[in-house]
Amino acid sequence: MPPSFAFVLSGNTDAFTTNLSTASVVSTSGRTVTITTNAASGWIVWVKDLNSKAGKGALQSATAGSYQIGGTSAAGAASHTLTVGAEDYGLATTINTDAAGGGVVGLDAAYDGTAAKAGTLDPTQFRPIASATGTANGDILSLVERSTIAGQTPAASDYTDTMTVIGAGVF
């Protein structure tokens, strides 16, 4: 049998479920990535951000003078709990399904989204967000962006970001 790797992203866009708020952490509705592969050594999924605020991924508003809401920790550092009332932005990855097939799915500590945490995105390079140790028959990851804002964050309805998500089998 030839090498096989299927990587299915559930959609191209992901909106926040409500307006960003100084009173709570707001999340997007999320997207899933489904991976099926016969790669004996598993698979890896990476992410890279488009917007950059001091070398950290960011939401950006054109109507607010290109204002950015960036992550607060270093890109690649362990994920953290966002602080209500302060500006922060990041990616939270969780495991929806560790399907049968032989490999064990693991989250990279930088983007581990369990317990309402998020990791600062990196606009300078692709960073791993999750991997598995063997073949997969439908492993599913959930990708959710989370953000908090401060009282002085400029009002705008066009805060956006673009992330590139890629994956590969480890043959």
Language-model region placement:
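Signature of Gram-negative chaperone-usher
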Residues: 1-171
